[in-house]
């Protein structure tokens, strides 16, 4: 049946397979330089060299019974001989847990491996070049196709033919697996551990387990590794999240309405696709069918409630679980990276939907640098590893993954542990290698928001200055919620990179700044590094009991182009912070506020009364070139990345908001710089 199904897919779905290749990105590797020098060339030669085994065998829909009786379905990919028979030798085994269905993985694998087709598509993608045009973002996305990320999303046939087994499993409640989709909760996490243990005990496994996968399949790697199953010896999470509420569900306390509806629709839609072969044979799994009927639209109720409940008193207990930090749901979503002992190669992007967590995860893992690696690209969620494998870039992501597994699952001394350990695309500069993040030598410094014009923009609500010392005199500036943020880097980030094809939105913030107050520094005279988290401290006044603030940190070029380096947002009434988890600089200023984000700690605003709050911006890594300026923009909305929960939106009345610039209670940005900006 396995080979028959393989023939069915290869004969009837080539068009879908080719389409799948266009929807996934890529990522890459590491050493003492970003391209890893001679070692990188060796890793690439190994990955692209002759296969140890000529074929690949697939066992379809293998049942794995969980401890509570629910049956998960897995495809098992094994090395095969020239006749297609699986090789009897036990191999290290790679486990991938996916909610996007192993059928999608199989189609993507067919696209990557189809003779003639995949090479043609990759060559076509390399030839697409919109650089220097207003649509250069198209090239940024298409260059991901040749970077190796697709093979980390799906099944890497070449990895298997080199002597690995891969197990791709539909997580509970998705694909052909029974049960109710748990969205990372404890039962789903237990399933991952039990699947790892099951794989380690099979005759085709030598008991040494690794994990691979992108996004959802990266998050469950972090969760599994934190539980330290004995068999799990290496992970390669590509674009993982950590604290999902703060990352994407409710950044700054506002609903992430740009990403969540489409993502939930995709997973819930895919999970309803039945096993067509079983259906045609009259033996469709009735338990699977009952489970899908019982819960066809998992988690949509939270989103609907968040945007429809009219007032705080009407919030139902179900939604309150998302708003209480000690709820079982919120606790299950915390990463506990500090408990990881398996060697970890982590890829993230400075504009990924999970950027907030990626450097935090790396720093929290208690392993020596080298045994843990961080690669951060100038990328969105859809294009991990864009350009990898090109001169000056890290090696392709599949190359890096192969080297990582060879080192930690096969004990091959290939030098991968000498890479990095932090390989970062420094915005405004390019690919760099450093020994830590944030970089050594930076210091958080105040720069004050001042009303005096900088003369650098005529399109923002107010053109102010960014100064090294407090301004004289008190000024109140007003900014109203608007929709110009629909064309912004934050919108591109929230939409996983789809909007990044338009440079005027993703690479220049001046359209979004039409609804913002801007504060711009003098030009820097020497290269100036920015590395780490950023905090914007605001002295605010509202006419209502709630509001929403967003801030960006921008690199302003001599021609006026304003490129967002990082951003953050905050619901005014949810400004309370957890001091034990927040970070401050030596003078007591917050550098990285950690919000409690709970209804119990909500602090409604007293209209007309000045209220200070801190807008934390995600960590960044950048270099201001001589002649460039630093800018902070402040706005009263950030749709679609974040929107006030409906009860709080009603309280805000979408009224204009006021920023007070008062030397006695100044507004300022606390930014990590290696040298002061005058």
Predicted regions and their residues:
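Alpha/beta-hydrolase active-site loop
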Residues: 150-151, 161, 183-202
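Short beta-strand/loop motif that positions the catalytic acidic residue
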Residues: 340, 346-348
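C-terminal, loop-rich substrate-recognition/catalytic regions characterized by aromatic stacking residues
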Residues: 294, 390-678
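Accessory cap/linker subdomain of secreted extracellular hydrolases
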Residues: 99-161, 226-339
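Conserved alpha/beta-hydrolase
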Residues: 160-176
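Secretory targeting and sorting signals
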Residues: 2-33
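Alpha/beta-hydrolase fold nucleophile elbow
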Residues: 203-215
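Catalytic-loop region of hydrolases
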Residues: 32-122, 153-155, 459-505, 676-678
């Amino acid at each position: 049946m396995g080979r028959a199904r393989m023939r069915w897919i290869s004969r009837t779905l080539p068009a879908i397979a080719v389409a799948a290749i266009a929807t996934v990105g890529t990522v890459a590797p590491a050493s003492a330089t970003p391209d890893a020098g001679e070692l990188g060339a060796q890793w690439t030669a190994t990955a692209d060299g002759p296969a140890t085994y000529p074929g690949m065998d697939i066992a379809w829909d293998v049942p794995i019974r969980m401890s509570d009786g629910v049956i998960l379905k897995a495809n098992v990919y094994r090395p095969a001989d020239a006749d297609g028979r699986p090789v009897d030798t036990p191999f290290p085994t790679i486990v991938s847990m996916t909610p996007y269905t192993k059928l999608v993985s199989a189609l993507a694998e067919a696209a990557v491996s189809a003779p003639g087709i995949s090479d043609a598509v990759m060559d076509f993608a390399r030839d697409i070049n919109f650089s220097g045009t207003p649509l250069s973002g198209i090239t940024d996305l298409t260059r991901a196709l040749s970077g190796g990320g697709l093979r980390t999303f799906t099944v890497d046939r070449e990895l298997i033919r080199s002597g690995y087994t891969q197990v791709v499993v539909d997580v509970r409640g998705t694909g052909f697996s029974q049960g109710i989709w748990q969205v990372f909760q404890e039962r789903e996490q237990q399933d991952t551990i039990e699947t790892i243990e099951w794989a380690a005990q099979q005759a085709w496994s030598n008991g040494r387990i690794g994990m691979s996968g992108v996004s959802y399949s990266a998050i469950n790697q972090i969760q599994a590794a934190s539980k330290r199953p004995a068999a799990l010896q290496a992970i390669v999470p590509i674009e993982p999240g950590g604290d999902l509420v703060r990352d994407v569900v409710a950044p700054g306390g506002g609903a992430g309405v740009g990403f969540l509806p489409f993502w939930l629709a995709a997973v819930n839609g895919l999970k309803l696709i039945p096993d067509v072969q079983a259906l045609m044979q009259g033996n469709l799994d009735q338990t699977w069918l009952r489970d899908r009927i019982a819960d066809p639209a998992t988690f949509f109720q939270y989103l609907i409630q968040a945007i429809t409940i009219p007032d705080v008193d009407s919030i139902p207990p179900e939604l309150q679980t998302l708003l209480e930090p000690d709820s079982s749901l919120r606790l299950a979503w915390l990463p506990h990276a500090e408990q990881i002992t398996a060697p970890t190669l982590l890829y993230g992007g400075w504009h990924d939907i999970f950027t907030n967590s990626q450097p935090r995860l790396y720093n929290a893992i208690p392993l020596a640098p080298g045994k843990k690696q961080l690669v951060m690209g100038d990328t969105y969620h859809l294009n991990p590893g864009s350009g990898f494998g090109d001169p000056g870039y890290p090696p392709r992501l599949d190359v890096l993954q192969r080297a990582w597994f060879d080192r930690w699952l096969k004990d091959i001394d290939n030098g991968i542990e000498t890479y990095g350990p932090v390989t970062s695309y420094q915005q405004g500069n390019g690919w760099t290698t450093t020994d830590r993040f944030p970089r050594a030598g930076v210091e958080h410094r105040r720069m004050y928001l001042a009303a005096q014009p900088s003369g650098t923009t005529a399109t923002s609500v107010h053109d102010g200055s960014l100064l090294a010392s407090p301004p004289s005199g008190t000024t109140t500036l007003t900014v109203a919620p608007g929709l110009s943020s629909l064309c912004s880097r934050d919108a591109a980030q929230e939409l996983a990179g789809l909007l990044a094809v338009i440079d005027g939105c993703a690479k220049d913030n001046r359209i979004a700044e039409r609804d913002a107050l801007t504060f711009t520094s003098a030009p820097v005279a020497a290269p100036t590094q920015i590395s780490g988290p950023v905090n914007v401290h605001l002295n605010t006044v509202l006419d209502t009991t709630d509001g929403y603030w967003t801030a960006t940190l921008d690199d302003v070029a001599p021609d006026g182009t304003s490129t967002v380096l990082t951003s953050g947002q905050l619901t005014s009434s949810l400004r309370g912070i957890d001091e034990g988890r927040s970070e401050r600089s030596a003078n007591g200023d917050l550098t990285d506020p950690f919000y409690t984000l709970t209804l119990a700690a909500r602090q409604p605003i007293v209209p007309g009364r000045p209220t200070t709050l801190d807008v934390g911006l995600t960590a960044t890594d950048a270099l201001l070139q001589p002649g460039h300026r630093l800018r902070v923009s402040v706005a009263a909305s950030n749709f679609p990345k974040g929107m006030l929960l409906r009860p709080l939106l009603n309280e805000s009345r979408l009224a204009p908001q006021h920023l007070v610039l008062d030397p006695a209670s100044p507004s300022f940005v606390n930014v990590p710089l290696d040298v002061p900006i005058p």
